[in-house]
Each structure stands twice: as structure tokens, then as C-alpha cells.
Amino acid sequence: MNNNQDYLVQMFEKQKEFQKLLTGLDLPKKDYTQLNYTITALIAELGEVLQADKNWKNWKRTKDIHIDREALLDEVVDVYHFIINMTLYLGFDAKDVINKFFEKNKINFERQNNNY
């Protein structure tokens, strides 16, 4: 495992610790109510990413719109928290995600190279 993969493993571990602090429970657990709440929160956070980036509305584009990159990054990181929670609720860990990412990435490149 390289350093970047180690970081993802650490992110998953930190999120597990945080969820235990919030709920008193270890993840993963098969709680589809919590999974649904997590997916709803993820969708809301994605909306907050859009609101933090004022340039997404091409019909309202004006010159020199300032984007608060720190606020935008905060929202993106919140999205990661909920994606990690969702992944944990589904019973996967960081290594599962890493392995599947590279497997799927290879397939995606093959598809594009073969006019998919």
C-alpha cells in the first residue's frame, strides 16, 4: 500500500471514530435507516458545494465572481465524510474502495479506448 492509500485508510478510521463518538456505536452496522439519512445528508452536502461555487449557473455568469475556495473545500470534505459513512454502512472499508477504484478505472479506460 502506498502513502496515498494509507491516507484513505486513515480517513476511514477517523470517520469510524467520529461516528462512534456521535452514536456510541461501531460501524459498520446494517442500519438502513441511518444509511438513508446518510444518503439524504450527502445529497444536501452536494447542494452546498453548488452554493459555494457561484459559477455553476451559466445563465447568471458575470465577470469576476469571487469563489471562496476555503468554503468550497470545506463543503467537498463534508461530502467525503458522508461518502465514507455510506461506504461503511454498506460494509466496505478503504481497501475495498481502493481495489475497486483501480479495477473500475481500468475498465473505464478500456471502454473509452474501444469507443464505448
Question: Where is each model-derived feature located?
Answer:
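Flexible "arm" and connector segments at domain edges
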Residues: M1-Y116
